[in-house]
């Protein structure tokens, strides 16, 4: 188990793997724990939230954290930290590991988190990473099915701390989750690494909030906006249409830019996709959606800082055989992606008779007029 734990840590938590004499937790806690990148992100966020809190003249200069679910990615930024874990073996591991991880200021309590919460004196922040497995070890995603049930404890949590940070499954619908907390959510952080969505992080506060701040993070790419600014829209200026056949591309328009001016293509990163803030990025970066559900954008000029991948468009074709032959001339290998397209990647690859790989990327999608397009980049 220790060898397997070290192997998992070497990928997920290299600082742990480099620490001699560390005891690694069992597989399930290691699977749910934050990666080093996301743990460091949460620590920076906690520091920022604390600084804002300490700016209040009535706030104490001493800061304290209670982690009700045994995590401690944010413990270093607090003067005192309390780790609550109901499994005694994990508490023993924590007591051994904390001094090695420069967390000697952390107190370990072996008890049920809800019991501790009711007896808790006021603290600066409470952190929770609810267990996402049921009594049979199966994965759960709904908040009410996780342990502890943060929704049921929401009022008590905010009595005990002015700031509550909750880590949740990235599988959750964040819009519904924010609504479930009935105005307590002030910030939503959607965290991805390597373009894979890893965590949904909520910051709860006592005052009601109508428009939470949404932060989309993918490694070094960060985009922020307020949730009421187009967060649930696909994009502005798109109308659904259909076509009875694969007509030539000439004359096609989408949004505010004609297809003959499509020079650059943009693919949003995983956090943007999870947020669904397509109208936000369309307006902020002056890029135009290819179609209502394509989630791909184009521009006539290059755009700096787009939160995702950018490509120069070499050619565009409908599924018209003559156009395809001309657009794909000389191509034997390609990386293919499909968005709102009737064929799968495998089906399209077979139809185009292309092998996987190479330096060329093909994006197959459907435009605002319902035409099926293949963009070579």
Regions found by a protein language model. Give the residues of each.
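SAM-dependent transferase fold signal centered on methyltransferase-like domains
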Residues: 1-377
């Amino acid at each position: 188990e220790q060898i397997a734990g070290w192997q998992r840590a070497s990928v997920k938590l290299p600082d742990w793997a480099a620490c001699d004499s560390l005891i690694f937790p069992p597989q399930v806690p290691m699977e749910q724990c934050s990666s080093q990148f996301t743990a460091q992100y949460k620590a920076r966020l906690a520091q920022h939230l604390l600084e804002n809190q300490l700016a209040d003249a009535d706030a104490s200069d001493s800061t304290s954290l209670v982690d009700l679910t045994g995590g401690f990615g944010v413990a270093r930024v607090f003067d005192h930290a309390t780790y609550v874990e109901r499994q005694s073996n994990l508490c023993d591991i924590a007591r051994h590991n904390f001094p090695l991880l420069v967390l000697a200021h952390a107190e370990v309590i072996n008890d049920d988190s809800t019991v501790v919460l009711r007896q808790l004196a006021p603290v600066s922040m409470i952190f929770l990473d609810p267990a996402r497995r049921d009594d049979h070890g199966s994965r759960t995603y709904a908040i009410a099915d996780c342990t502890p049930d943060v929704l049921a404890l929401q009022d008590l949590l905010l009595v005990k701390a002015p700031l509550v940070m909750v880590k949740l499954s990235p599988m959750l619908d964040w819009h519904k989750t924010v609504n479930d907390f009935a105005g307590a959510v002030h910030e939503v952080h959607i965290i991805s690494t390597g373009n894979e969505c890893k965590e949904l992080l909520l910051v709860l506060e006592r005052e009601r909030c109508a428009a939470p701040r949404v932060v989309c993070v993918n490694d070094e790419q960060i985009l922020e906006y307020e949730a009421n600014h187009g967060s649930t829209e696909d994009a502005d200026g798109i109308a659904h249409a259909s076509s009875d056949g694969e007509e030539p591309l000439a004359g096609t328009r989408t949004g505010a830019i004609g297809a003959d001016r499509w020079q650059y293509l943009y693919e949003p990163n995983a956090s943007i996709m999870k947020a669904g803030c397509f109208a936000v990025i369309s307006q902020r970066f002056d890029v135009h959606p290819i179609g209502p559900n394509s989630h791909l954008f184009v521009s006539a000029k290059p755009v700096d800082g787009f939160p995702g991948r950018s490509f120069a468009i070499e050619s565009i074709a409908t599924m018209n055989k003559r156009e395809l032959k001309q657009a794909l001339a000389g191509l034997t290998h390609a990386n293919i992606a499909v968005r709102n397209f009737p064929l799968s990647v495998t089906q399209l690859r077979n139809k185009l008779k292309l092998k996987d790989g190479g330096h060329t990327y093909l994006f197959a999608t459907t435009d605002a007029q319902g035409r099926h397009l293949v963009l070579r980049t």
